[in-house]
A protein has these predicted regions:
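Peri-membrane helix termini and adjoining interfacial loops of integral membrane proteins
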Residues: 118-132, 253-263, 309-313
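TM-adjacent membrane-interface loops and short helices in multi-pass inner/ER membrane proteins
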Residues: 142, 279-320, 327, 334-340
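A membrane-periplasm/extracellular boundary helix in multi-pass inner-membrane enzymes
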Residues: 186, 207-273, 281, 287-288, ...
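Transmembrane alpha-helices of multi-pass inner-membrane enzymes
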Residues: 195-203, 361-414
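Transmembrane signal-anchor hairpin modules in multi-pass inner-membrane enzymes, especially those
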Residues: 1-60, 64-69, 75-96, 100-103, ...
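Membrane-interface catalytic loops of GT-C/OST-like multi-pass glycosylation enzymes that act
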Residues: 12-16, 65-69, 140-144, 188-195, ...
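Short aromatic-rich membrane-water interface segments that cap or initiate transmembrane helices
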Residues: 9-13, 61-69, 131-146, 269-276, ...
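Alpha-helical transmembrane segments of multi-pass inner-membrane proteins
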Residues: 3-6, 22-35, 51-59, 69-86, ...
Length: 550
């Protein structure tokens, strides 16, 4: 459970592929070891509906190359949900393993994040990445993902505190909680601060309710949750650490600590909020939704749609491959009806489950973990990453298991589990081999495997899973000439839907000019100028004197 969050392994053109494969590897290992069961019919129907919409969108659009990875992610979530349903029905050890794994991942990442904050990670070498001093992100390489892991760990720590009867273990909650709050400060994540507020206030309300209903003679040891004031103390502790961490980093310079802009409190000042580009981002996405409200732009097409659209107002200034809000993302790529069906169905399931009436510690932990991920999903896209898919799927299964039926023969069930695990191992092995192969073109020639040092691009054609990365490499490495203009124009037009960045746009414009498609070249140049004005100006300065005027 902990390894996908902790692994430092990255490489190749897509930074999250190895993390995704390791998450699937955890799913395969858990299938071979832990009991499983089917989730509820409603949950199965929801995952099936999502898969159907993605398939239909890919069939009628240009997202076919994204279809297999997306279906793989949905299959991973569904398999994790089966494991979670097994926990709910049989109360096996996986629920305990989920909490322990998150505790291990979160506490180790918190220590690593603080080391990164103070810029003292050189001794770890390749075991970690090194962000700019004054920021921590563990091995997740993104502050908000790091903050969400820390928040998940806080929920797991609360479960550990609630289910343990050992006074010594209960006393560890306070220092562990302090470390986790410090790590949230080091992340500088506003998402993490929002999650901390919700966790502190929500659990304080639960602790107050627990004490109100307890007998008068009950003592502190009789309560599962810490006292409400202790839980709420996490909020002023965050504020204090927001000043203390930069104060220590500056060697005791109070002025530097006050002026430090790396923390969340500074970023919540009015001047910071008015320049926040997420508002512009969502406004752009709403514009795109209004243009194609029924069927959307197609799965994986947001980045192209954003580049190709000339907005009447402010424009989000970089490549936009996610709406940073899950309902909006579903609406812009799959259409409003699909988004309403998927999100509305999920909200109906949550309402029917009545989480506010929950008492079982395992289910409460699952609700807390699910809530942390969903809060992040309203601001970014954690469900595009394997470790969060794994936790999300387990929580879905724990909260919505199928009704218990007559037990099946244990031998048949174990055989099915081993067969499913073996299937996952084959899929992971093929994907790892194919990705390693495709990654060779992104390495210097001397660093490539010997079989791929010559004619590398030709040997990479035909990849099932990573053809977009191969096409991108070909476009960016191949010069446009009159002889290959038609091929490069078709290829650049295809890659533009994968990554509409200046290097690709330039090849599309140059090939269109060589083919005599001046009007098309002018149209793409105008979009280039609006989307990337600095890169467009540099390109114009470097164009030959005899190049067509744009």
């Amino acid at each position: 459970m902990a390894w996908p969050f902790l692994s430092p392994l990255v490489g190749g053109p897509s930074i999250n592929v190895w993390q995704q494969l390791m998450s699937w590897g955890c799913v395969a290992g858990l299938l071979a070891m832990a009991p499983f069961a089917f989730p509820s019919k409603g949950l199965r129907a929801g995952l099936a509906v999502m898969a159907v919409f993605v398939v239909l969108s890919a069939a009628v659009g240009t997202g076919a190359t994204l279809l297999l990875p997306t279906l793989g992610a949905l299959a991973g979530i569904a398999t994790a949900a089966c494991l979670g349903a097994g926990v709910a029905q049989q109360r096996g050890p996986l629920g305990h393993a989920l909490a322990v794994g998150l505790l291990a991942a979160g506490l180790l990442s918190a220590l690593l994040g603080l080391l990164q904050y103070y810029g003292v990670t050189e001794f770890l070498g390749a075991l970690t990445s090194s962000p700019t001093s004054g920021r921590g992100w563990g091995n997740l390489r993104q502050p908000n993902q790091f903050a969400t892991l820390i928040s998940l760990t806080l929920v797991a720590a609360l479960w550990w505190r609630a289910t343990s009867r050992s006074p010594r273990i209960r006393r560890l909650f306070v220092p562990a909680g302090g470390l986790l709050v410090a790590a949230l400060v080091a992340s500088g994540s506003r998402t993490g601060f929002l999650q901390l507020l919700l966790i502190a206030i929500g659990t304080a309300a639960m602790a107050w309710r627990e004490r109100r209903r307890a007998p008068r003679h009950a003592g502190p040891a009789d309560f599962r949750l810490p006292a409400p004031p202790l839980l709420l103390a996490a909020i002023p502790l965050y504020a204090a650490l927001h000043w203390l961490l930069p104060y220590l980093a500056s060697g005791g310079d109070a002025g530097h600590a006050v002026a430090s802009g790396t923390g969340m409190l500074h970023r919540l000042q009015p001047a910071a909020v008015t320049t926040d580009s997420r508002v512009v981002l969502w406004h752009n996405v709403l514009t795109l939704i209004a243009q194609r409200p029924l069927a959307g732009w197609g799965w994986g097409e947001l980045s192209f749609a954003h580049f190709a659209t000339l907005y009447s107002g402010p424009r989000f200034p970089v490549i936009l491959d996610n709406a940073h809000n899950l309902p909006l993302h579903l609406a812009v790529e799959l259409g409003i009806p699909a988004a309403l069906l998927i999100c509305g169905g999920f909200l109906w399931m949550v309402g029917a489950a009545k989480p506010w009436c929950e008492r079982d510690p395992l289910r409460l932990m699952a609700w807390g973990l699910l809530g942390v991920i969903l809060v992040h999903s309203l601001l970014e896209y954690p469900l595009w990453y394997g470790p969060f898919q794994l936790v999300f799927g387990l929580c879905l299964g724990i909260l919505w298991p199928a009704s218990p039926k007559r037990p099946e023969a244990s031998g048949k069930k174990k055989l099915a589990a081993f067969a499913a695990a073996a299937t996952w191992v084959v899929i992971i092995g093929y994907a790892a081999w194919d990705y390693t192969r495709v990654s060779q073109i992104y390495l210097p020639r001397d660093a490539r495997m010997s079989a791929y040092r010559d004619d590398t691009l030709a040997k990479l054609q035909g990849s099932w899973l990573f053809s977009r990365q191969v096409d991108f490499a070909e476009v960016t490495l191949t010069a446009v000439t009159p002889a290959n203009a038609a091929h490069m124009h078709e290829l650049a037009g295809r890659v533009l839907h994968f990554s509409p960045e200046p290097r690709v746009i330039v090849k599309l414009i140059e090939s269109a000019e060589l083919l005599g498609r001046d009007a098309e070249a002018h149209a793409w140049a105008e979009r280039f100028r609006v989307a990337f004005p600095a890169a467009f100006a540099r390109w114009l300065d470097n164009r030959p004197d005899d190049a067509p005027e744009l």
